[in-house]
Amino acid sequence: MAQLVKLGHEVTILHRRADHDLGKKVANLQADRNNVEQLKRVLAGKTFDAVFDNAYDWEHGTPASVVEGLGRLVCDQVSRYVFMSSVAAYGDGLNHHEGDALAPDDWPERYARQKAQSERALFKLHQRYGLQAVTLRPPFIYGPDNPFYREQFFWDRLRDKRVLVLPGDGRRLMQFLYVKDLVNVMVKAMTVPGAVGHAFNVGNPRAMTQTEVIDAFAAAAGKESKVVRIPRDRILRVGGHPMGPHLYFGMYFDLPPITLLVNKAQRVLGFKPCTFDEGLKETYKWYLRHHSKTSIDYSFEDQLLAPALMAS
């Protein structure tokens, strides 16, 4: 939103709260998007150049019916509907093109299933009713103000001179996108005429192993990393989980790999992301200004690491 305001756009946020802390230049609409009648009431008589649908309810999920409901309501009121999907919409697999099949309706993981179903619903609205839909599929997003304990997880431990847990053999692939590059490509998705009706993979062109990721975090902080490889089955057996409470590799960070190819976004949207190292350098500056100085409970990691450290 800050970027849209900076570019001179009139910006409105629609959410459940009666107010916000985004500044006086951002107007406020209060509604629960799950309540169609509320949406109808607050959107009545209003038109927008573009809608950015970025919200996902991690507690209850955001089903395709909710996304489709908003799309139907604004179909004749907007010239662009930009939906934030995810690399997870593919379900699994490596080196995906945009034309690859998305996760089916019976996919077991809710987030991936709902993102895939939402994309299918929006493109049906585009085909049948002319909704000017564009979808974006980013991988792991990193950068300042990340609400997930990810980059900070590693930097906290590196600064405390902790040994890091490396799940498995360290070769699991991860792919990233700096948040400022995501913002820039969202603006492009709003303005480029040829984007309508298309999905775009957006991320750094090269995937990285988890070993390389740890090395990059250490380099950004100017620290040396010490790691111990621990089999995933042992991590899970003693209570570790990617979503916590017993984290071992950041929040929701150690996941089966899904990677994508970004040639289409480069060609159509002029997508030019910064390197992972460049983005981490800026993110670390933010971290130094904002990180919490409270003590961290390392007892679970100590439990994981103890056998390996005793054997070494």
Where do the PLM segments sit?
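NAD(P)H-binding glycine-rich loop region in Rossmannoid oxidoreductase-like domains
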Residues: 20-23, 27-77, 90
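Conserved SDR Rossmann-fold cofactor-binding beta-strand/turn motif
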Residues: 137-138
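Glycine-rich Rossmann NAD(P)(H)-binding loop
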Residues: 143, 167-172, 200-207, 218, ...
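Mid/C-terminal beta-alpha module of Rossmann-like enzyme folds, strongest
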Residues: 188-250, 282-284, 291-293, 297-312
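Residues in the short beta-alpha loop(s) of Rossmann-like NAD(P)-binding domains
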Residues: 17, 87, 206
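N-terminal Rossmann NAD(P)H-binding glycine-rich loop of SDR-like oxidoreductase domains
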Residues: 1-9
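Substrate-positioning beta->alpha
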Residues: 148-154, 167-190, 197-198, 212, ...
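Conserved Rossmann-fold NAD(P)-dependent oxidoreductase catalytic core, especially the SDR/UDP-sugar
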Residues: 68-116, 124-128, 134
